[in-house]
Amino acid sequence: MADDGMLLNFSIPETGILSRPSLKGGNWRDRAAAKKAAQNWHTKASARLTGEKVDKVAKKTVENATDVNRTQLGQRTRRASKSPEVHEDIDRPAKRARVSGDFRPKSNEKSAAEAGDYRPQINPGATQKPSERQSAPKGAKGGKQVISSLFTYNPTSTTKTQAPEKRHDEEPIEPSNAPLSSELDTFTSLGISTTLAAHLLKKMDLKAPTAIQKAAITQLVKDDSDAFIQAETGSGKTLAYLLPIVQRLMELSANMKKHKDDDAVQRNSGLFAIIMAPTRELSKQIALVLEKLLGCAHWLVATTVIGGEKKKSEKARLRKGINILVATPGRLADHLEHTEALDVSNVRWLVLDEGDRLMELGFEQEIQKIVGALNLRMRGNKTRIPGLPDKRTTVLCSATMKMDVERLGQISLKDAVHLRADPTEREQEGDEPQDERSYAPAQLKQSYAVVAPKLRLVSLIAYLKRAFTRKGSVMKAIVFVSCADSVDFHFDILTSNLEEKNEKAEGTKDDTEEKADDDEPKKSTKKPKAIPQADPTKLSVTHAESPVLSPKSHAVTAYRLHGSLQQSLRTSTLAHFTKNNDAAVLIATDVASRGLDLPNVDLVVEFDPAFAREDHLHRIGRTARAGRDGRACIFLMPGPEEGYVDILKTDRKDNEAGITITRQDADDILTRGLVTSGIATKNAYMDIAQDLQLNVERWALASPARLESARRAFQSHIRAYATHVADERKYFDIKSLHLGHLAKAFALRERPSGMKAPGLRTGAGRNDRTPAKIRGANAAKIGSAPAAKKAVDLDIPDAKDTEEAAKMRKAVRAREKFMRHAGMADEFNLG
């Protein structure tokens, strides 16, 4: 070296020379894991050589790397610059090594914190010992927990927020489903008797008919032809077909009394009308309206036969005699086959309510069987009853004219008259329909909220808190979600006290206040107190006070409703929600979207968009009924879902095009709902929302049952997301979902790919609550019994439900097969 005139000065660092392995080949995930392991080994080896602590060595390594980059870049800048105006002491901004996804230079850390930037600076557990890292609480078995901020790396909206146009000459919107205001349009002018009209006014507070009631009553009272009633939700279709039936039966009874004083229509006179509805809840509601209507004709008797009830008690009521029957198709077909006391030879009216839903639920075969049985038994009875139609009159009610509804009309209708709200639109069957679409009520105020996946949960809570802030501003609200598991999860959150100190999981701290400490934290020897919380897998409580939503001035009651609840619980929940005169919120699936007339519902929130446009219209139709005002809001995520706004705009008729659908952002919702008092800073809502999210996550981690409920809700939500109709799947593409961000909306800190799939909910897919031993004994008896005796003696209320469950399982298996071929089996754990 010296012979060449060169002198090299090697400076060996204090830590010595440690070899760094070169990682090549293999998968990029394996290389990243090996690189991280080598870096941790190098840090610990340096700490052993210098005697310093691990975190200090890691910090020094980052600073040295930053200094080297600054020197090299500064020298390179000075060499490249030839201008004398450039000062040599001005270097290029420092370039720091990227650590844990931090893209900002070190010099900007302070300004970012002051500006309210919540992006993570450095991974607090990257240089900690295993004993110093945050341990997973009990019940959180599985993958590594990820605690991320709500306001980092959220997708940006693809549409721009437009300020609403102010129209000074805007006229008030007239309700499209309100009762007619003309003095000439009364029930008596339509052919209703004064006795029945007075009863409607005094007992039911109905002064005038709606447009669809006027068209239907005029036709059905005077004519015996079949009819197809098409009208928007909340327009009074139930009374449109009930009033003509009751009026004709009252006239029949009056005519019979004229000939014989003791002769009149009684319960043993025969069954004259059958009303079929797709769901049990709608059947119960129709029966309730019919019971009020028959208050002026006490000699007429009506009853219901629906799934989930005891067949023995239903048979007893049928033996006593009835005049009007409200039923679901599956149970009615079963009684027609096995109950001899059910005589349908005198049936003169058959009503199919919500015809589109009847076909969607797969009741086509049952309806064909019922219509065939009615035709066969009516031919056998050739006795003519004066005052009744000579043939059976069939009435089909539906909000849309889809292909399946037309097929149902071909099965049941013959020479039907098409009735609409506008009498000028009446048309005979076979004419080309003028408009096959259905629309939302004109007075309904619609809006949509663009909310990032991570902000969905806190935004929903903030939106509802804002709605119930003032007493009387919103009496009742309905929140629609996609699946039953999601209903249970959100109900448990709203009815829990998230701010209780004893609900923190063992080993967790306030994540926003955790600081790195040199000493190891002392392990607590105290066991956490038992939390008096019911198992969320047991569906026994369906309503409770909501501490999360209740302001100081009044309490808010939360309810839940879905198809997996027992029929008795579903009925009692709806009854309690209907009779409650205080503020209340109902979290439900689409089981509450069809035909239910729930009073004082001022707000409908579609937290999960409906699977089809028709379901969306039925959801928002739970408010703004019978001329009342109402509001509806749908939550959409940034990206393809924002294109769904074009579908929302088709909810209005052409003459209502001036009515705009307003937009809301997550920032506005959180600010209005969470920042309630005092002078708040610009980003104050971020701190409150972050604390609320952490409270929900700690609440979920505090109990294995809650954590299982959250996982089940997340996975069921993903499966339901993949079931949108083909025409709308471009807006709801499951491949565009960020599963990790969406998991945070379900209070989960685990990676979706490492999440274990829990089992089915208690009783899911099966309504029989008998023990397994008894079910096995009954199955053995069934196998040895004759076929004829099996059909008559067995009381199996869920026979039809089992068949429907089999159809649903077949559809789910087909969906799972599609997901596996699409490469999504790892996220859903379906393989």
Swiss-Prot record:
Residues 65-180, 419-441, 501-543 are annotated as: Disordered. A motif (Q motif) lies at residues 185-214. One of its GO terms (biological process) is endonucleolytic cleavage in ITS1 upstream of 5.8S rRNA from tricistronic rRNA transcript (SSU-rRNA, 5.8S rRNA, LSU-rRNA). It is found in: Nucleus, Nucleolus. Residues 456-670 form the Helicase C-terminal domain. Its main location: nucleus. The Q motif is unique to and characteristic of the DEAD box family of RNA helicases and controls ATP binding and hydrolysis. This is ATP-dependent RNA helicase DBP7. The lineage of its organism: Eukaryota, Fungi, Dikarya, Ascomycota, Pezizomycotina. The gene is DBP7.
